[in-house]
UniProtKB/Swiss-Prot annotation:
The N-terminal domain interacts with the head of the 30S subunit; the C-terminal domain interacts with the body and contacts protein S4. The interaction surface between S4 and S5 is involved in control of translational fidelity. InterPro entries: Ribosomal_Su5_D2-typ_SF, Ribosomal_uS5, Ribosomal_uS5_arc, Ribosomal_uS5_C, Ribosomal_uS5_euk/arc, Ribosomal_uS5_N, Ribosomal_uS5_N_CS, Ribsml_uS5_D2-typ_fold_subgr. Transmembrane segments: none annotated. The keyword rRNA-binding applies. This is Small ribosomal subunit protein uS5. With S4 and S12 plays an important role in translational accuracy. Residues 50-113 form the S5 DRBM domain. Pfam families: Ribosomal_S5, Ribosomal_S5_C. HAMAP family: Ribosomal_uS5_A. Part of the 30S ribosomal subunit. Contacts protein S4.
Length: 202
């Protein structure tokens, strides 16, 4: 992940200014107040230990009035492995710029994840799995996350494992429908399922 000198950051939004001035000290405050993150630097400040994983890099063609143009499309996941995760997509004619755009979008899309011990086979009360069965969808792909007891691990495809690990999920069973070979939709379906753990009304 490229290093940004946050001391040189000039916030463009009211939320950004509040974060830089220390009026908002945790990312939890942002979501508790339903505020919208429009600057990735906010995430850099409030989640300094954020990790990044490149999920996919493809060469895609874009039709323009001048003909076809090749671009790189990057899919990136970010997370702190402790209840926050984001997924983003970026396109550019340069690989590095595509990855940077995807990383920026992933930070802007970051969401809290509600974790727990939702399996009836386990009663440890530790946040190692999801607290209940939850689903997410993107395109033709639908992913269902099922609470698993401690020690099961991540029973999921490779792309899903990365997103789940970055969110801080250690044990889960998954069910999938649709074309999971499409990395973008697969990653977004898992991300949407994780996001639904937070917004689901108990």
């Amino acid at each position: 992940m490229s290093v940004v000198d946050l001391s040189l950051w000039e916030p463009k939004t009211a939320l950004g200014r509040m974060v830089k001035e220390g009026k908002i000290r945790t990312i939890d405050e942002i979501f508790a107040n339903n505020l919208l993150i429009k600057e990735p630097e906010i995430v850099d400040i409030l989640l300094p230990g954020l990790k990044q994983e490149l999920l996919n890099l493809n060469l895609v063609q874009r039709q323009t009035h001048a003909g076809e143009r090749n671009q790189f499309q990057a899919v990136v996941a970010v997370g702190n492995e402790d209840g926050y995760v984001g997924v983003g997509i970026g396109k550019s004619r340069q690989v590095r710029q595509a990855i940077e755009k995807a990383t920026r979008e992933a930070k802007l899309n970051i969401t809290p994840v509600r974790r727990g011990c939702g399996s009836w086979k386990c009663s440890c009360d530790e946040p190692h799995s999801v607290p209940f069965v939850v689903s997410g969808k993107s395109g033709s792909v639908e992913v269902t996350l099922i609470p698993a007891p401690k020690g099961v691990g991540l029973v999921a495809g490779d792309v899903a494992k990365v997103v789940l690990r970055l969110a801080g999920i250690k044990d889960v069973w998954t069910k999938t429908r649709g074309d999971t070979r499409t990395t973008l939709n697969f990653a977004l379906a898992v991300f949407n399922a994780l996001r639904n753990t937070y917004y689901f009304k108990l």
